[in-house]
């Protein structure tokens, strides 16, 4: 009998420790073992990915059938991926393998519990709270213990690639703006230099990344060891009590990127923490604890697994409230899925969106967070709260899908399920409904950092501003502005002068009241994304014409509203961390299609909730 010839397909499981799929591959006792990672063109072109998340280009759907034949493959093994695009891709690869007589082995390992099994135990419905997740998880039993890394791997055999390459469709290319050269491919499995090394950004046609954060299994396990060594921190961690203004080092673990790429096993993290918590008197508990963050992550993964593509949009999503935001998404008339384009129903709201993305809102706390996000690919979860609330229900009244797309592009820990879920949560579109709890772009930052050191670090224009004015520089007298070496003028986008910082986009107190009033109406109307009136446009008859009206007032000095502290069960609990260019955007960005949500998948029939 011929011994197995096995391809192991690495995707979001870039590790050797606790890999059920890798163990299944090695348990076959293969005579030949090929560990393969492919640059999937979907993520190169159609998924927004900034430089900080890039560290043989052909679609796996066409590449693997060729490898099956050229290498006489008998088995292909990979870890399960419930992201919507990944399901579609894996279905095609699986069918191609079966057609070629290749056995397919798939194992779950990306989450604490198998997301599909969670959905099954939850009656086929998405998990909308960690209480629901825990109830479904309890029916599956405790989280499985991690398995050790293999001591060695079989050598790969010959790897001929003397077959024609099917070049992928490169349009639309969401990442064209950040390429310095044409996209690059190579035809040797060993890479462009023949040394099997990870490609550099330059070798892929991009400028160097700017993030200080680095990946890899070795660094992930070292970071976990350091966290676990501090038993008090590990056992008493409460995420809402960690500071979004703390940097170098940050206040939280920063392990979320490792969970995304799979360089750290979520089960390894869970059990290492649980062992400390179980032996520590006075330990914190979910949802605020470290384990609570992992539960939120599983909750979002299961919600996505239940709904598929429509989870990532309002349209046709029966669990997402319909709110008539500014800059709403356009939809494909055939599939009902959003395209990545958006309607500009308000030119001023479009300018607000551009200023928010550029970190030029005129509110230093918001701008510091957005600049940190772009430069480093990561911000603290409360920082994500602040900028998301500001863009949606607490300031601009702009569609959460616009912010979700920016996070998709810039976050190094971008998980599609967590990013979408967090934006729905923070916009009060799903998961959370206390829309009257808004984050002040002034008072909330002052709560953590009265002197404004975080702002001085990420908004260097204001580094010499007196602490009295650093959160509200427009209130500083001209003499104080001159002393600080900065003038508050302009919008930060057009005719920007050196030594200036923009005026605030609007009077926050007024905008907050407008947004809360508009949210109240939306909740009273009570439409969800799959309701006919939300889909056919007749919702307009149910809403006043001044919904979330745009009205800027940049000159007034105004009062601030600190975030209210009331909590109730799932309502006020904090979401998981894995939530997800200052250059001015041009109008072409509105015409790009997002394959993150666009597919030929059929839209499910409406269902009442």
Predicted features and spans:
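Active/binding-pocket-proximal capping segment
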Residues: 311, 317-322, 383-432
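Contiguous, well-ordered alpha-helical segments that form the cores/surfaces of helical PPI scaffolds
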Residues: 253-257, 268, 298, 351-354, ...
């Amino acid at each position: 009998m011929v011994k197995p010839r096995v391809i192991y397909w690495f995707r979001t499981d870039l590790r050797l420790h606790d890999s059920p799929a890798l163990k299944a591959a090695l348990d076959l006792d293969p005579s030949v073992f090929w560990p393969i990672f492919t640059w999937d063109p979907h993520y190169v072109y159609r998924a927004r990915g900034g430089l900080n998340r890039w560290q043989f280009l052909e679609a796996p759907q066409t590449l693997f059938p060729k490898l099956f034949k050229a290498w006489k493959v008998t088995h292909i093994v990979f870890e399960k991926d419930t992201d919507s695009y990944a399901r579609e891709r894996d279905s095609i690869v699986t069918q191609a393998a079966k057609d070629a007589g290749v056995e397919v082995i798939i194992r779950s390992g990306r989450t604490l519990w198998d997301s599909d099994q969670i959905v099954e135990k939850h009656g086929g419905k998405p998990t909308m709270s960690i209480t629901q997740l825990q109830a479904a998880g309890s029916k599956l039993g405790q989280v499985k213990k991690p398995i050790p890394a293999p001591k060695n791997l079989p050598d790969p055999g010959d790897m001929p690639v003397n077959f024609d390459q099917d070049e992928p469709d490169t349009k639309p290319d969401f990442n064209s703006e950040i390429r310095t050269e044409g996209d690059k491919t190579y035809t040797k499995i060993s890479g462009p230099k023949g040394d099997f090394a990870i490609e550099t950004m330059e070798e892929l046609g991009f400028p160097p990344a700017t993030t200080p954060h680095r990946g890899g299994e070795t660094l992930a396990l070292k970071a976990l060891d350091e966290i676990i060594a501090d038993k008090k921190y590990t056992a008493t961690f409460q995420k809402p009590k960690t500071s979004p203004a703390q940097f170098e080092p940050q206040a939280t673990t920063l392990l979320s990127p490792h969970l995304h790429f799979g360089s750290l096993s979520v089960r390894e993290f869970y059990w290492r923490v649980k062992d400390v918590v179980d032996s520590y008197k006075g330990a914190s508990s979910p949802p605020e604890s470290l384990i609570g963050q992992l539960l939120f992550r599983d909750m979002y993964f299961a919600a996505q697994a239940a709904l598929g593509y429509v989870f990532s949009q309002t349209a046709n999503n029966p669990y997402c409230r319909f709110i008539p935001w500014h800059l709403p998404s356009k939809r494909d008339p055939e599939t009902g899925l959003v395209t990545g384009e958006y309607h500009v129903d308000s030119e001023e709201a479009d300018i607000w969106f551009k200023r928010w993305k550029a970190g030029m809102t005129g509110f230093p706390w918001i701008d510091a967070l957005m600049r940190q996000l772009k430069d480093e690919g990561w911000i603290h979860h409360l920082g994500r709260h602040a900028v998301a609330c500001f863009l949606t229900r607490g300031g601009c009244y702009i569609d959460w899908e616009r912010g979700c797309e920016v996070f998709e592009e810039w976050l190094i820990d971008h998980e599609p399920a967590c990013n979408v879920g967090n934006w729905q949560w923070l916009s009060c579109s799903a998961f959370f409904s206390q829309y009257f709890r808004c984050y002040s772009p002034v008072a909330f930052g002052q709560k953590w950092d009265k002197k404004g050191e975080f702002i001085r670090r990420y908004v260097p224009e204001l580094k010499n501003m007196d602490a009295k004015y650093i959160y509200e520089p427009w209130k500083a007298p001209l003499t104080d502005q001159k002393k600080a070496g900065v003038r508050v003028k302009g919008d930060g986008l057009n005719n920007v002068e050196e030594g200036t910082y923009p005026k605030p986009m609007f009077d926050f107190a007024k905008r907050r009241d407008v947004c809360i009033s508009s949210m109240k109406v939306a909740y009273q109307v009570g439409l969800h994304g799959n309701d006919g009136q939300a889909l056919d446009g007749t919702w307009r008859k149910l809403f006043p014409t001044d919904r979330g009206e745009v009205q800027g007032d940049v000159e007034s000095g105004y009062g601030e509203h600190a975030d209210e502290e009331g909590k109730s069960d799932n309502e006020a609990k904090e979401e998981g961390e894995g939530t997800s260019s200052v250059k001015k955007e041009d109008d072409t960005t509105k015409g790009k299609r997002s394959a993150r949500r666009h597919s030929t998948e059929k839209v499910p029939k409406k269902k009442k909730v």
